[in-house]
Amino acid sequence: SKIIIIDTYYLLLGSISKTPEQKVIQTWHAAGALKKFGLEDKSINLEHKQLIKNYLSVYHFTDYYLVSSDIMKDVFIKSLDAKPNQILPFGLPRLDQYKDKHEYPNKSKKLALYVPTYRDYTNEIHTIDKQKFEKMCPEYELVTKLHPSITSHDSDPRDIQDLVEMAEIIITDYSSLSIEAALLNKTIIFYSYDEAKYDEMRGLNQYYYEMTKENKAYDLETLYKLVNLNKINHKIKPMWHQYTNFDATQKLVDFINKGA
């Protein structure tokens, strides 16, 4: 294949070779990044030269990176050793689906969607009690969508994109889903009850702290107040979506047809 399109970094790419004619395009699997990864990952020992060489062989397999903001350009440069001339400010094809918003039947209660980040360093599952939440926030119905690997707790079976479109309020923590929801002008509340621990274990970048100066709760009482207030944080969307025009797929196709 002359063109290889990927949406994350695959370790196996470091062990194979490509021809000079082949081009690899990174479309990325998320609307942005709030967690540190790649060369900025807290678990990586930068003094381990062979390990870093192995990682770089994976990262350097990519020729182009699609971004929807200058922030993600900066993230790819720092995290994956991308070069400025490899950045394509086309927006992300995965976000084109939101060009035509779907209409959903009005319900008696507005939907509050809770989407917690998967924590791979603990078996503890922190959920929000639905009955208590709906008592404290009587205008809302709480729906919880957990990571697919978590099967010990109830999780709404509907598609996450459908739920995001249906919801009035998105409650999350360190997930890039907040960036995706901001594109739809949703109210986003960060329920970051274990922020210090998560930062210690996984690493949160500066952009997380910048965009969570508003609408952040460390406890349930504050969360209830923010839900009832229902105030949109208008800073998130311009941070991450300066190149999002819902035409990224067409731009990518045109780029490939011109010879990539």
Predicted segments, located by residue:
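Donor nucleotide-activated moiety binding/catalytic core segment of transferases
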Residues: 1, 148-179, 183-184, 195
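Active-site and donor-binding regions of nucleotide-sugar-utilizing enzymes
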Residues: 1-99
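A short, gly/pro- and small-residue-rich
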Residues: 14-33, 130-133, 185-197
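Active-site regions of enzymes building and remodeling cell-envelope glycoconjugates
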Residues: 19-25, 141-142, 150-161, 214
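Conserved catalytic-core segment of nucleotide-activated headgroup transferases in glycan assembly
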Residues: 78-79, 87-153, 217, 250
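Catalytic binding pocket for nucleotide-activated donors in carbohydrate/polymer assembly enzymes
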Residues: 176-241
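C-terminal alpha-helical cap of glycosyltransferases
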Residues: 245-260
